[in-house]
């Protein structure tokens, strides 16, 4: 089988004096893995994400930023629980970021705070991102009433080109002053978005959002996967991490929905927000927003929530990176 072939090739390479292991200094995998350990793969992925993201839904309705922020309670909730069950603060911070539903952010933070847990954290983050359609709908239905699910939101206003260009510039400046530790991620996110929205660097934006992000994703998956060796991955801590990851997703989804319900108490009737977009604050783009749309259509086939849900969804991307910067600043 393939395993015996790989074992045979590995033995041949070692007999020839060639280094092949990811932890063997000088091997190809080890060189590629430095992009993970030194933390420059995730910022490059954020560059690509910024170049493919349209922030119009958020700019047209800025209060949706608060929904994205509320969903980050999952991160800090999981952090507190991880501390309570025996993880040290740095490990707990790395585990908590799973609740942000952002794989590159989870890898970036865990590579800084808990490199020994990075494989389990990365697998957990990406696994639960894929399980968003399974985890979120029951929570959304349980926490909302029929009348709340039928709320119709105002159509988003048209956003000018000037606003689209100014948003990443202002975002970059605010990030620099408020959360400097998150600058490697958010700085690249806003820079990538500026490439897209400026209109004069279309080729660079297309490269960042296409070939570059695809290449880095392949290298990231290859090296993180190669680092998850059985002796380090199949442990009791890994099981705890998977459990905490699931819990953080539940907390994040619930906190987003509950926040919208509370926020609606202070909004006039025509300005209310459909609580079904509260789940979209979990930054699994665009899966969380699609779930808002799918669940909403079950109760009203003419109520399209996707464009509204994209606001908290992209806000969640920013929020998870801000949370990572806060944890990094306090714990290192």
Predicted regions and their residues:
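Alpha-helical transmembrane segments
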Residues: 116-134, 242-252, 277-280
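Transmembrane helical segments that form the transport core of multi-pass membrane transport proteins
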Residues: 172-260
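Membrane-embedded hairpin module used as a gating/binding unit in multi-pass transport
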Residues: 124-200
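Entry/N-cap segments of selected transmembrane alpha helices
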Residues: 55-79, 231-257, 309-313
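Alpha-helical membrane segments and immediately flanking helix-loop junctions
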Residues: 38-39, 46-52, 67-77, 81, ...
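Juxtamembrane and boundary regions of transmembrane helices in multi-pass small-molecule transporters
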Residues: 80-89, 121-149, 255-269, 315-332
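Phosphate-binding loop of NTP-binding sites
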Residues: 1-25
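Structural signature of hydrophobic alpha-helical transmembrane segments
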Residues: 30-45, 91-99, 126, 180-190, ...
